[in-house]
Amino acid sequence: MLLQDLKNKKIMIWGLGTEGQSALRYLKRHDISRDIIIYNDTPMEVPEEFCAYVMKSGEDLASLLNSVEVVIKSPGVSVYKDEIIRAKANGVYFTSSTDLCFSEIKLHQPHCKIIAITGSKGKSTSVSALYHMMIKQGLNVGLGGNIGRPLIELIDGGYDYIVAEISSYQAADLTVSPHIAMFTNLFFIHTGWHRTHDNYCRDKLRLIYYQNRDDICFVNQRNPELNRFISEYDGKNLFYYNVENGFHAEGKELFYQQEKILNINDLKLCGDHNLDNLAGVFSILQHLRLDIHQAARDMESFEPLAHRLQKVAVINGVTFINDSISTAPEAAISAIKSFDGNIAVISGGIENEQDYTDYAHCIDNNTKVKMAVTLFQSGPLIAETIRRESQRKDLKLVEANSLEQAVISSYEELKSCGGGIVLFSPTAPSFGFYKNFMERGQHFIDIVNKLDYK
């Protein structure tokens, strides 16, 4: 849907978070419609700039939906809600700020190319690295989506490129696809919003559903689940990375065919797994005909994102790593493999039917993991799985009552054996315990900063 199609329509903004507020500001600034209802699932204090609009919450949602023509939905609102399914059947049109941006840019700004990256893990770092290297080579680039600014704010920016991180929530109801897409991987995650794992994977892949013959998609050949579902899109322009005749990661190095491009040890990024994603990023840069060797040099100045294998402090030989972004066992497995020396790993969050068997095997097979600490709702299941799958007698397994206890126990253990890494890699979402992974990561940082340095 184009913005001009919203002119004088009866509109509902569903969800007054960051995206909802940006959408409302855009409609207001361009005088697109004055017949707008704001709906939030729970009561909230409306910012003063929006006080002129009707605000609803907790009322008869079905009646409200039937009273409007268009709903601009926030990403947190699942497309699988019964109310949405019924409203669509009654002719109510649903869109989002992401879809509005993609529509406007692709149909009205042909000079601007949209590059969108998604995946279960690695999308934020991939998007940020791509943006960093494009800016370094002098391109006019906007950054938005699930990172940076809401995409609707970039429509009037006059950019030549828009680099977007797209979540499964944002991809699920797209009606326009980006010019260039990249998939990092698919893991078992987020089934609550999507109802099933298959829905989750197909919602991710909807990012390329509307790509045409001039568009392109880069796919990580090394991720089995991604390749299982991408096979449904054989008719699209799919190009694979992490293959021998293209960009691929080997050990701590990134290659193009037989030529070494960079070494992870020359970067500020922690984690060899980042090279898998950089193979996709460099594939995009090559497609844009940018200088690959210059890009490799520019990566050396790239600053890692907070809460993603973030080095917090070193105290008495113990290094504290904040990986709060880790919301799946696969992320923690990659994190463990990223470090040498003694490791105490802290994991646990909300229980969302994750399978921790591979995580337990990783701990069992890595004798450098001296202690595993579990906590929160999923803690008992993680501990039970480790006990069942691990044969190690030297592994210390602690079920903590709080994050503070987990940090202190890990610190004391590693300090007593000459130092090491305290790795906070939760393996599960934070909802119910923290507002988001950033708040969770900051709590870890605050605890570390209060430790006794003696």
Language-model regions, residue ranges each:
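Residues in the short beta-alpha loop(s) of Rossmann-like NAD(P)-binding domains
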Residues: G17, T42, I147, R222-N223, ...
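Phosphate-binding loop of NTP-binding sites
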Residues: K28, A62-N66, P75-Q221, E225-K236, ...
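Short internal beta-strands
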Residues: I36-D41, C217-Q221, I346-S347, K368-Q377
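Nucleotide phosphate-binding/pyrophosphate-handling subdomain across enzymes
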Residues: L2-I11, S22-Y26, H30, I264-V369
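Short, basic phosphate-binding NTP loop
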Residues: M1-A116, Q137, E300, A306-Q310, ...
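Short, conserved loop/helix-junction motifs that constitute active-site signature segments
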Residues: D31, L174-S177, L207-R213, E232-D234, ...
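Residue-level signal for inorganic ion chemistry
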Residues: L27, V71, I117, N146, ...
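C-terminal helical cap/extension that packs against the catalytic core
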Residues: T357-G418
